Amino acid sequence: MKRLSLAIIFACCTLVMAAQDAIRVNHQGAKPTFSDFITAYLAPTYGEDGECDTEYMNGIRDAWERHRKGLKLDEGDTFTLDAKNGFAVYEYKYSEGACEFMTRIEMCLWNEADGKHKLFAYNHMFYRDGLYYPGQYDGLTFMRYDNATRSMKYHPDKGVEAVYEEKSPSVECSFALPRSGKDIIVVFWDENGKKTEKILKWNGHGFSY
C-alpha cells in the first residue's frame, strides 16, 4: 500500500466534510443518546449520480447494525460500545501473507461547556504489523452538534490543525480518543516506527495543543 501524507489526507477530508450538509441526529427521548450520534454519522449519503459517497464506511456500518441487533459480527470484526463514557471502537483484523493488518475506528462524544453544543469525533486508523500505516481514509474528523437545530456540522479543531502544522513531513501522527477522561493522545511515528506522545487538552469547546 502506498503511504500517503497524513497532512494531505487531512486536508482532503476537511474539504469533503465541509461541503456536506448538516447531519440530522434523530432521537426518541428528550435528548439524543451516544448511539443516536453513531447511527446518524454512519448513515449512508448519496451523490447526485445516486452512488453512495461513503462506501468506505460499509464495514463499520454493518458491524454497528449487527451490534445493535445483537447479531454475530463477521469474522475479524469486533465492536465495543461504552455508552456511559461516550466511547465506541470498531476493529477489523486480517492477514495477507506474513503481514497482519488492522483497521481501527474510534468514536467519542464530549459535552461542551456552554451546555448548548456537543462535539462528536470519528477517528480512522490503519495498522500493519502493529505499526501505524496511514491509508486513504485515515484521519480525525469532528462534528459539532447544536441542541437547537438537532443537527451536527463539520467542525475543524484548532488544536488538531496545530499538530499537523508542527509535525515534520517525515513523521506520521495518529490519535487516540479517550474512553475515560476528555483529552486526546497524539502519537507521532518516525520512519523507523518509534513513537512519541503528546496531549491535546480539552478546553470546554475543543482542544488546545
Q: What residue ranges belong to the model's regions?
A:
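Short beta-strand segments that buttress and anchor functional surface loops
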Residues: V89-K93, A121-Y127, I184-E191
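Mid-length scaffold segments of soluble, non-membrane domains
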Residues: G115-H155
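Short aromatic loop motif centered on NTY/YTY
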Residues: S151-Y209
